Amino acid sequence: MYVVNPILTGPEDLENRYNNLKPEAKVGQYAKNIEAIINAYYAKKDAGFKTNIGAIAPDFTQNDVDGKPVTLSSFRGKYVLIDFWASWCGPCRQENPNVVAAYNKFKDKNFTVLGVSLDKQEGKQRWLDAIKNDNLTWTQVSDLQFWSNAAARMYNIESIPANFLLDPKGKIIATN
């Protein structure tokens, strides 16, 4: 028996096929890779429930452009658009004028934006320049860990731009 690519058959089917293998077939690097795929699938599936519409947004803290820690829950009482983006992301930069327009339209109506950058440490200056050049006047944070950004992982971000709109109680009311 052999295992079929999970993209073609789905992770559940991969798991079923793996579970039906004989014990001696479950040793070695290929078996470890298959286990890793199955475990990653369930981890992402579980993480997704935390960021579904209606869920309370997972709290996180990251440093702002001045190195000061900012916690998402400190914005409770306002509508918050969490905007995951990066200076190197063309679609993000193209979307920034729309985010600026929304911010300017609603900033006096109990609304703000929290930008979360997926830039790298070596791209910090480019991130700061993009904030200035794109007129992003709201709070910006990042741990400068690229796709390993802790908040992005918590929110199961696989592509950017990505957005989550929170109500004043911190509940997710819309995405993207």
Q: Residues of each region from the PLM?
A:
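Short beta-strand in the C-terminal region of the ABC ATPase nucleotide-binding domain
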Residues: 173-176
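Structural microenvironment flanking redox-active thiols in thiol-disulfide oxidoreductases
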Residues: 94-134, 144-153
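Short, internal strand/loop/helix patches
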Residues: 58-63, 128-169
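Active-site acidic short loop of glycosyltransferases
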Residues: 76-78, 108, 136, 157
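Oxidative protein folding and maturation machinery
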Residues: 1-70
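A short beta-strand-turn-helix
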Residues: 60-80, 105-106
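Short active-site neighborhood of thiol/selenol oxidoreductases, capturing the structured segment around
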Residues: 70-93, 99
